[in-house]
A protein has these predicted regions:
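Active-site-adjacent loop and "lid" segments of alpha/beta metabolic enzymes
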Residues: 1-20, 30, 61, 76-91, ...
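Non-catalytic propeptide/linker segments at domain boundaries
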Residues: 32-60
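A short, charged/proline- and glycine-enriched loop
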Residues: 62-66
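Short acidic capping loops at alpha-helix termini that bridge into adjacent secondary structure
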Residues: 222-225
């Protein structure tokens, strides 16, 4: 099978996904074959690559958006177990986060499942208290949690399992009429980092996301309401993460807005020499801006102020807002 990755270029002929990034050429990718640059791709794919993406939560996808991470959990990898979700969400919104992603179950490597009732108890009060400050998404794998979160004011469901964990979640999303983010993960948090393996991680994740989209569409969720996330750090080694990030523009070929979540991830600490998760904001921003250069629309981060500032300077220097 052939895959065509748009190669971002400042003076490119076409706009990527109707946004700020441009391209004129493609990298032709095939399993077991060396990549090569080509000047043409199938017309249907070109139309998909250039079509503007639908708004998400009322936000245009023609510019990068900041999603702030709100941990309503006592065991998140990044905050050392100290949390106040409502206060955290207010700080993120004030700092420039346009979406607040509220989660009540840690999905860090090795984390154990949280009972549904406990997860609901954690997220619903936080969502209710943040309603009106920014758009709200709920980070959950469970249908019951999503239903309660939607009733409290969540406008998007962010499922790290891509409907693998709870098949009933697809029906909840379909009936709600809300958008959903489908992430790729190999395995579950308890075991996903034990020994992840792929034939070709970039292409395997592409195919897996395509299958998740097809399953969502079959459940009654149109592609226009789907966001995709390649799942950096979820069942992937450092080498896997880097392989995806170097060519992440490939995923625009799936016809959905793309979300990138790299904030404070272990590979940033490993490469950047930052053992403590909270010390990884500079590395996070570097990877985030690399994703922006490849047209990635939504960036899920802990540090909204640093990201807002970085994006403002990126726009000023590159003309990325034109």
């Amino acid at each position: 099978m052939e895959y065509f990755r748009p190669i971002p270029c400042e003076t490119g002929r076409w706009r990527l996904a109707g946004g700020w990034a441009r391209f004129s050429q493609f990298e032709l990718l095939q399993r077991g074959v060396a990549p090569r640059v080509v000047d043409a791709a199938p017309e249907a794919l070109l139309q998909t690559l250039t079509a503007p993406r639908p708004e998400v939560l009322g936000l245009s996808m023609a510019q990068p958006r900041i999603m702030g991470i709100v941990n309503a959990t006592p065991d998140s990898f990044s905050d050392g177990g100290s949390y106040d979700g409502a206060a955290q969400g207010r700080r993120l919104a004030a700092a420039g986060a346009e979406i607040l992603d509220v989660g009540g179950e840690s999905t860090r490597p090795g984390a154990r499942e949280v009972p549904e009732a406990d997860e609901i108890t954690r997220v619903v009060p936080v969502i209710a208290s943040l309603r009106g400050l920014a758009a709200i998404s709920v980070d959950t794998r469970k249908a019951g949690v999503a239903r309660a979160a939607i009733a409290a004011g969540a406008g998007l469901v962010n499922d790290v399992s891509g409907f693998d964990f709870d098949p009933g979640l697809a029906q909840v999303v379909a009936e709600s009429g809300l958008p959903v983010c489908l992430m790729h993960a190999q395995g579950i948090p308890e075991t996903m980092q034990d020994d992840p393996s792929y034939g070709d991680v970039l292409l395997d994740v592409y195919d897996a996301l395509a299958a998740r989209i097809a399953r969502a569409e079959a459940a009654g969720i149109p592609r226009a309401r789907i966001v995709i996330d390649p799942g950096i750090g979820f069942g992937k080694t450092q080498a896997h993460n880097l392989a995806i990030l170097r060519r992440i523009s490939l995923y625009h070929g799936l016809g959905c807005a793309v979300l990138l979540g790299v904030s404070r991830k272990r590979f940033i600490g490993s490469i950047g020499g930052a053992e403590v998760a909270a010390d990884r904001s500079a590395g996070t921003l570097a990877v985030t801006l690399a994703g922006v250069a490849q047209g990635i629309q939504i960036h899920r981060v802990h540090d909204a102020e640093e990201t807002r500032q970085g994006l403002a300077l990126w726009r000023a220097v590159t003309g990325g807002d034109k």
